[in-house]
């Protein structure tokens, strides 16, 4: 009996739908070009329409797309076959049986059945797919903007704008045939996260609206989106060509959004639109700015005051008439009333006689707070609202109607009910009130090579022609160009890249020789082995600094092909990302102020001991005072970040299985060994079933009973968009990024618990108080696509245990641990009488990704991997103490004896003016003495106005905010206490770097807004209130700020006491009508009183006053 081919097809069940796959064709022993030709040959059909499986031992593959001679003998010469001449079932999906297997943001993965064979296809369009099963999931159209995959997990949270099916051609040992946009190739399918790609320029528009930017691109189409980190933006992509204006909404300006456009990313800074509009409208007028910014509060207060008095009068007048309403409201709020009255007996600031509120002085009212009896000491002992004793509580039942009426009618209860009524009426009233061209190669004059086209073209290039439009011949000593359109021949000197001897690596022809001449051997090799379908002519890659080779691979990524994961990760870095440069290093306006007193004097230096809690965002502004110095000197310590650095080792990557590709072969007779002759063992995920030919399960022309075998393998399609990388923890170290500013300049540095930081005048060290965060040495952690770290039950490498961590892959999706052979629990098979056999794959290898729900998220803050071996995890709690030792020479606090001499003065700046980022300046000079100095400069404000100059070389980092370019302007260095000794430093150079960030970078009002925020901050106001007590507090050393607070509290109480006395006297004077009562001075004298009739009365005059004793 002869072995016979079967039209086997595969039925794969995954999720809630079946998946069908075609036979795999395999010949992986030849190079990449021959593999594609092998696939094309297998698609040829014979005259009967039967698909033939070619015999590996006899098949011959010819160069230049030639196929072997036909077995029928009809042709005696090789025939050149074009790809377009081959039958392509993927393009005929509308007339064939097809099924949609996966839909991404940019393409679709579907399969078509033709003559009993299933073909896998990927397409960027939905043309002719309307009749396919599952077509209801298709969108109206796919996005056509250029994108490239994101293989670096850290970038997915910020840059991902959707998903796309890709073909990975680098995994040669696991490839299978696939068609992408009708182009056949061998590879593996993978679903990847993607980001925009392309040349895009982001610039601020010079119009009145300061929230509008302009986006410009030389490409035919480009995409942009304003994305909040971690959000899904696949349905918010906006495409454009040329240029477009974008106006940010108030929601976009919350400091958590990024503008993504092509290869660039720009963070939308935090901007309060209401504040910025007022700053611009009322520039340089802080009172109008304050009124404008807080207008809503002023308006609310004014309306509330206008509404309050009429409502108050109405409620007081109707409280007795509408007592039923108050009873109903009291019944609703009875628990609250009961609690308030109960707690009042324990309130310390109440009068012991009448029970009313008493702060300092108090005049008792006629009625007690219970509003029932007269106020007296005897009644206060009986009043249940004032006194709480066990005997009195027994007399009252809190659920009785008597107790209810008592609680409702107390002064506390009645005031509460009136307040609730006033609030409800107020809300009711207020609610009704209105409120370039891509990289090309030129021969000599008008003949070019353009990526994506395998023909020589002229400068009239529109699309890739069918034949050469010109020709470029590389000779030994010259280059000859022939233009077929103009019949002009030009000869020029040999100017190729030297030393490009690569004949053994490439197949030479005229075009390849020319490409090697202009770009070198490496590019010529990939040009021949990895062609481009679409050259993306307008894309230059200048933003990412791509050379010819890297630009070619980037365009391959745009075409849906991943060649090398390592190169792809390098392309993941985004240009123009001003995320860090926008953040102010030291936001000192929100820090508390302290006076710093020296701890000791060592070798003529004042030693200051500073201790700060190791907490992110904390800091202190220290003032250094000395009797000999005229002004206090400022020293700012800012703990910018506190985080734990974990050193890890990468174990593997795991990802969910999106679908499965299966190939198998059936024999009528024989065993597995016979089947394996046609379907060799691949090394993993192989299977073989025998017998598969028996009564009721035979194929046509097969009469065998209890014979035959079905063997094959399966390959998974992984969803790398949801991949996790598994690491093992090796080591943990606490690190802190600390910034200092003040008279020692401005700089940021990193302090580790292992290595202290020492520079200039200070030394910084960490006293760690590590909190256990659940991560231990040797523990496995998972880094997810959301940039968070997870811990839990995770399988170790090469461990088949049923825990999260399978399938185990390399970071590029290459299986590194899997089953060699599938057992009976992993698959099932079925057949029909005189029909086709089907294989159902239950599980193609280990799959435990669903167990990710059992993992625990370690931190709410996303982590950032610095490389594959370490990452940082920020902490929101204190990790210990930061200790700084500051040693300052005593000369800094003394008046200089002479005018200092500065030499080798250098002052250079770079950055922008009229922007919030400012100019970052580096100053250096050599001084002959040590002194403290003040800095001033016209048209500029400085990050620090005081510096400490030491004898010898000095270097400082300063930030200047200027209204104009300060180049060639003078900075005045004024020694402490004597302006006559001032020296000047000239600004040597200013490199203006206008960042491509937006809104506040080119805004002339940015500095004014910063100044307003600083002047109106809570800390500034609090410091202003305490300032009258600075003189007294300065005598208490390090308790300076504490003494100021204590004195302020005492002053407030004294003022309240005085005001209370004055108010009591005035109230009594008015209440007793003393201003109407005459004072009758009657000591020993008397007056004649009139008789009852009132007649004959004589009044005695008062004797004259005697002033002799005065």
UniProtKB/Swiss-Prot annotation:
Residue ranges, annotated region (Non-covalent dimerization): 153-171
Propeptide stretches in the record: 1-8
Any single biological process term in GO: virion attachment to host cell
Cytoplasmic side of membrane: 343-459, 1066-1110
Keywords: Disulfide bond, Fusion of virus membrane with host endosomal membrane, Fusion of virus membrane with host membrane, Glycoprotein, Host endoplasmic reticulum, Host Golgi apparatus, Host membrane, Host-virus interaction, Membrane, Transmembrane, Transmembrane helix, Viral attachment to host cell, Viral penetration into host cytoplasm, Virion, Virus entry into host cell
Gene Ontology cellular-component annotations: host cell endoplasmic reticulum membrane; host cell Golgi membrane; membrane; virion membrane
Residues flagged as site, Cleavage: 459-460
Transmembrane segments: 291-342, 1045-1065
Motif window: Cell attachment site: 14-16
Glycosylation positions in this chain: 46, 92, 186, 566, 582, 957
Disulphide bond pairs: 90-121, 98-132, 200-261
Residue ranges of the region described as Disordered: 1091-1110
Domain of life: Viruses
Lumenal side: 1-290, 460-1044
Domain notes: The cell attachment site present in these glycoproteins may help in the adhesion of virus to cells.
Family: Belongs to the tospovirus envelope glycoprotein family.
Protein name per the record: Envelopment polyprotein
Lineage: Viruses, Riboviria, Orthornavirae, Negarnaviricota, Polyploviricotina
Gene name in the database record: GP
């Amino acid at each position: 009996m002869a072995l016979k081919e079967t039209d086997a097809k595969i039925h794969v069940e995954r999720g809630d739908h079946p998946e069908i796959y075609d036979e795999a064709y395999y010949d992986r022993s030849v190079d990449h070009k021959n593999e594609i030709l092998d696939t094309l040959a297998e698609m040829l059909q014979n005259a009967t329409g039967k698909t033939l499986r070619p015999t590996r031992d006899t098949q011959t593959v010819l160069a230049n797309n030639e196929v072997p001679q036909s077995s029928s003998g009809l042709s005696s010469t090789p025939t050149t076959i074009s790809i377009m001449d081959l039958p392509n079932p993927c393009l005929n999906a509308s007339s064939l049986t097809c099924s949609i297997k996966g839909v991404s943001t940019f393409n679709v993965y579907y399969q078509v059945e033709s003559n009993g064979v299933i073909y896998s296809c990927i397409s960027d369009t939905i043309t002719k797919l309307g009749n396919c099963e599952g077509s209801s999931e298709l969108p109206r159209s796919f996005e056509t903007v250029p994108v490239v995959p994101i293989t670096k997990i850290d970038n997915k949270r910020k840059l991902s704008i959707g998903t796309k099916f890709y073909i990975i051609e680098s995994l040669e040992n696991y490839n299978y045939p696939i068609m992408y946009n009708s182009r056949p190739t061998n590879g593996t399918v993978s679903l990847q996260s993607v980001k925009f790609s392309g040349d895009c320029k982001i610039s601020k528009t010079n119009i009145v609206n300061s929230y509008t930017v302009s986006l410009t691109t030389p490409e035919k189409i480009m995409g942009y989106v304003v994305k909040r980190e971690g959000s899904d933006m696949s349905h918010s992509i906006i495409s454009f060509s040329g240029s477009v204006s974008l106006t940010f909404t108030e929601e976009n300006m919350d400091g958590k959004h990024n503008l993504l456009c092509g290869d660039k990313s720009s963070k939308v800074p935090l901007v309060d639109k209401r504040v910025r509009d007022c700053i611009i409208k009322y520039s340089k007028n802080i009172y109008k700015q304050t009124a404008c910014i807080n207008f809503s509060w002023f308006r609310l207060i004014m309306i509330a005051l206008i509404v309050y008095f009429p409502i108050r009068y109405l409620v007081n007048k109707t409280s007795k008439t509408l007592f039923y309403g108050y009873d109903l409201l009291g019944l609703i709020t009875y628990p609250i009333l009961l609690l308030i009255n109960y707690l009042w007996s324990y309130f310390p600031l109440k009068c012991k006689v009448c029970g009313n509120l008493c702060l300092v002085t108090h005049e008792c009212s006629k009625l007690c707070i219970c509003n029932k009896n007269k106020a007296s000491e005897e009644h206060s002992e009986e009043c249940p609202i004032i006194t709480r004793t066990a005997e009195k509580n027994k007399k009252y039942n809190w659920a009785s109607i008597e107790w209810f009426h008592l609680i409702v009618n107390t002064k506390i209860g009645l005031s509460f009910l009136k307040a609730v009524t006033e609030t409800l009426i107020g809300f009711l009233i207020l609610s009704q009130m209105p409120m370039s061209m891509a990289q090309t190669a030129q021969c000599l004059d008008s003949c070019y090579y353009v990526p994506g086209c395998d023909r020589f073209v002229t400068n009239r290039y529109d699309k890739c022609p069918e034949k050469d439009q010109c020709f470029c011949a590389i000779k030994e000593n010259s280059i000859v160009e022939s233009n077929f359109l103009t019949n002009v021949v030009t000869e020029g000197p040999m100017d190729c890249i030297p030393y490009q001897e690569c004949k053994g690596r490439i197949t030479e022809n005229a075009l390849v020789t020319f490409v090697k001449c202009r770009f070198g051997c490496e590019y010529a090799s990939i040009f021949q082995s990895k062609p481009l379908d679409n050259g993306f002519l307008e894309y230059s890659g200048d933003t990412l600094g791509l050379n010819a080779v890297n630009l070619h691979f980037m365009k391959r990524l745009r075409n849906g092909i991943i060649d090398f994961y390592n190169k792809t990760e390098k392309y993941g870095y985004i240009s123009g990302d001003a995320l860090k440069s926008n953040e102010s290093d030291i936001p000192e306006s929100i820090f508390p102020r302290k006076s710093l007193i020296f701890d000791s004097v060592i070798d003529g230096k004042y030693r200051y001991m500073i201790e700060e809690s190791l907490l992110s965002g904390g800091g202190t502004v220290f003032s250094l005072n000395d009797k000999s110095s005229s002004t206090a000197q400022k020293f700012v310590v800012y703990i910018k970040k506190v985080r734990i650095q974990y050193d890890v080792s990468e174990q593997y990557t795991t990802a969910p299985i999106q679908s499965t590709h299966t190939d198998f072969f059936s024999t009528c007779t024989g065993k597995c060994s016979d089947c394996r002759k046609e379907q060799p063992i691949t090394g993993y995920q192989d299977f073989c079933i025998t017998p598969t030919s028996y009564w009721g399960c035979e194929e046509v022309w097969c009469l065998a009973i209890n014979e035959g075998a079905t063997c094959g393998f399966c390959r998974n399609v992984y969803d790398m968009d949801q991949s996790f990388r598994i690491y093992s923890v090796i080591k943990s170290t606490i690190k802190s990024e600390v910034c200092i500013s003040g008279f020692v300049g401005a700089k940021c540095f990193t302090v580790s618990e292992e290595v202290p930081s020492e520079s200039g005048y200070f030394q910084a060290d960490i006293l760690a108080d590590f909190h256990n965060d659940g991560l231990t040495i040797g523990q496995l952690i998972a880094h997810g696509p959301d940039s968070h770290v997870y811990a839990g039950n995770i399988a170790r490498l090469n461990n088949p245990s049923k825990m999260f961590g399978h399938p185990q892959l390399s970071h590029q999706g290459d299986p590194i641990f899997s089953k060699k052979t599938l057992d009976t629990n992993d698959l099932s098979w079925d057949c029909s009488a005189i029909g086709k056999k089907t294989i159902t794959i239950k599980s193609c290898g280990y799959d435990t990704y669903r167990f990710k729900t059992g993992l625990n998220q370690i931190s709410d803050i996303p982590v950032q991997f610095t490389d594959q071996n370490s990452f940082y995890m920020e902490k929101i709690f204190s990790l210990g103490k930061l200790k700084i030792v500051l040693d300052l020479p005593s000369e800094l606090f003394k008046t200089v004896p002479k005018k200092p001499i500065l030499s080798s003065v250098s002052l250079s700046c770079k950055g922008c003016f009229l922007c919030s980022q400012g100019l970052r300046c580096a100053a250096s000079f050599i001084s002959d003495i040590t002194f403290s100095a003040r800095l001033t400069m016209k048209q500029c404000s400085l990050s620090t106005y005081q510096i400490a100059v030491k004898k010898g070389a000095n270097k400082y980092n300063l930030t200047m905010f200027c209204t104009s370019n300060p180049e060639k302007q003078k900075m005045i260095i004024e020694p402490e206490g004597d302006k006559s000794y001032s020296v000047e430093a000239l600004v040597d150079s200013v490199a203006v770097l206008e960042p491509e960030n937006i809104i506040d970078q080119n805004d002339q009002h940015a500095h004014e807004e910063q100044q307003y925020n600083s002047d109106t901050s809570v800390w500034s106001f609090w410091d202003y209130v305490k300032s009258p007590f600075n003189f007294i507090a300065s005598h208490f050393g390090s308790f300076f700020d504490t003494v100021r607070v204590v004195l302020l509290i005492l002053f407030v109480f004294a003022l309240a006491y005085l005001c209370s006395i004055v108010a009591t006297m005035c109230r009594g004077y008015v209440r007793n009508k003393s201003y109407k009562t005459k004072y009758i001075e009657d000591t020993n004298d008397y007056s004649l009183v009139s008789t009852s009739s009132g007649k004959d009365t004589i009044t005695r005059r008062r004797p004259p006053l005697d002033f002799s004793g005065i």
